Amino acid sequence: MPYVPMTEYETASEEVRREYDDQIDKHGRITNMKRTLLHNVPSFKAYMEWYTLYDELQPVLGDRALSILSYAVSSGNDCLICGSFFKKILEDGGDDPDDLTMNETEALLHTLGTCVSLDPHNIPDYVYDGLKERFSDEVIVTIVAFCGLMVATNLFNTVMKVDLDEVLYNHKLLTKEERRNG
């Protein structure tokens, strides 16, 4: 059960309705997370900066690599909503998220995302070296900031117990325990 209910368009302020309309115009729908965040528009806008960083990284990394990175962070954090969201994107693209075929850069980003979520104090040197070989300092900072916003999104959804969006039901991420127990 969610910690707080989602906002409802019908009872929302004009400012919140504008954000709803903008999300529907851009994405065709509004997610449960965004509806929950819209209890506070500045909080909503802060989390939406994830899209700003995505748009900066997309020409450099591509959509698939960003989805792999986001999936690694989110599944490592056991975030039901975000893990399921990126699982769906990968599956819709023809991938098996549990058996990804990746190029070297995608594998590096997957490792980075996993390390960020599981043990950020001990990211191996080879990950940093691989990033330095491939990207400028500016891009590396953007990648790590993107991971940070992904972690923040994972945390928000988990702490607030936001309900899984219906469109994700068929792509539900198994918990770490469910994955361990097969």
Positions of predicted regions on the chain:
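Hydrophobic alpha-helical segments
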Residues: 1-182
